[in-house]
Amino acid sequence: LKKDHKRQTCDKIVVLIDAEVEQQLVTERLINERISTWYVGGLIGISQSELSLEDVEHKIESMPAVLNAEVSFDLRGTLLIAVEQRKPLVRIIPIYGESYYLASGMIKIPVTGTDVARVPIANGRLTNAMIKKVYTLSTYVHENSFMKALTEQIFVDNTGDLVIIPKVKNQRIVIGDITELEEKFSKLIDFYSEGLNHIGWDKYKIINLKYKDQIVCR
């Protein structure tokens, strides 16, 4: 039985990506394209004895967006590729140089060679110190379902304030620094639900959360 299993050829490749569809940097199409590049002629028709599953795993894990990969054959000859993707939090768009994603652990993932993930973009005065703050803010946004749904862009203005540009058009939410982010989010959510729901979300162009225990709007 073991010998017969070794003779089993790869009849099909199934790729499973452990990530929400809108946040997939790695897709089945991309994995199959890479396999065609790494292995001349592809893997369909190759026998299990001729293929190092560990080699396939290492190659897939060399992709910057991949955290972990597990590869195995089932008894029907299907090559199963399970990919655990890094979690993109924000796309950094610097004034100079190439844009990239920041994933959990502040891991940089080049845009080249990945699919497009629907995460907030960050731009403006992006010094190294400010990028660290953008990462912290993005982490808090990602973990808050309301803020995650609201946030379109994170902008660093000329004074060094962090500003969230929401999907509500023509509005800015001034966060300021990364101190007391949970409190600022809580104030904003209450303001939207108890205030703007009655007068309209587009009533104010600027919502300033910088100041403790108050919201300044204009």
State the predicted function of each range.
Residues V15-A19, V83-K87, G113, N123-L126, ...:
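Flexible glycine-/small-residue-rich
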Residues I175-R218:
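Extracytoplasmic/luminal low-complexity segments enriched in Pro/Gly and acidic/polar residues
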Residues L67-N68, T78, K87-R91, K108-I109, ...:
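Short beta-strands and strand-coil junctions in structured, solvent-facing domains, enriched
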Residues V71-G77, V156, G200-W201, L209:
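Short, glycine-/polar-rich solvent-exposed loops and beta-turns at beta-strand/coil boundaries
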